[in-house]
A protein has these predicted regions:
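A short, basic N-terminal segment
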Residues: 1-59
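Conserved catalytic network of the ASCE P-loop NTPase/AAA+ motor domain
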Residues: 52-56, 90-95, 140-144
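Residue-level preference for the first positions of well-ordered beta-strands
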Residues: 58-62, 98, 148
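Mid-core helix/loop region of P-loop NTP-binding domains shared across ATPases and GTPases
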Residues: 4-20, 43, 108-115, 123-171
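Post-Walker A helix-loop "phosphate-sensing" segment adjacent to the P-loop in P-loop NTPases
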Residues: 80-91, 122-124
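Phosphate-binding site recognition
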Residues: 57-59, 105, 124
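A short hydrophobic beta-strand->loop->alpha-helix junction that borders the nucleotide-binding pocket
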Residues: 96-107
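Walker A/P-loop nucleotide-binding motif
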Residues: 55-77
Length: 172
């Protein structure tokens, strides 16, 4: 480009105009946040859930929309805004306010708790019984003070039988 001032560009973009092609391409391919009204409302609702006082039946939120409408991006933005906080470096304890878990392709409790353990960075032994996995996941969730559990692709519950769906919903 021959004009170094680029008055038609936003100030934060002007510096990229003369950057090498690889850098400009990388910037173009990066994720972008577009804060439309419903996305901002979803973020506000999740913030409200995060600060909700503990009680027996905690409220929940379900983000619903067609594919490629940005549901996962909303969750990712929220998660990035609430990153892990070191609590006690000497003991290695951390606080994980928001934990995002990918729902397994079917409503399988063992796979779900394996996904929770993986998201927490905990070891998971495939041969462990469901009760062992569940106990370990619950202990680590409490120890890391997880305030909000986000389950992405929760509609995968529907791929199971009615009995599997009910059992999994009861688990949640």
């Amino acid at each position: 480009m021959s004009n170094p001032s680029y008055p038609h560009l936003l100030p934060q973009i002007r510096a990229l105009a003369d950057a090498p092609g690889e850098i400009r391409i990388q910037r173009i391919r990066a994720d972008r946040w577009i804060g439309y009204a419903r996305a901002e409302a979803a973020l506000a609702a999740m913030d409200d859930l995060l600060t909700f006082p503990k009680r027996t039946r905690m409220p929940n939120l379900l983000l619903v929309g067609p594919s490629n409408y940005g549901k996962s991006m909303i969750v990712e933005k929220f998660k990035r805004a609430h990153l892990r906080n070191p609590v006690d470096a000497a003991e290695g304890a951390i606080s994980v306010p928001v934990l995002k878990v990918q729902m397994p392709p079917a409503p399988d409790e063992r796979l779900f708790f394996a996904a929770v353990l993986e998201a927490l960075g905990a070891p998971d032994r495939n041969h462990d019984r469901l009760a062992v996995k569940q106990d370990m996941a619950m202990r680590i969730l409490r120890a890391t003070d997880v305030r909000l559990l986000v389950i992405d692709e929760v509609h995968n519950i529907l791929s199971g039988s009615r009995a599997q769906q009910r059992r999994f919903l009861n688990l949640l």
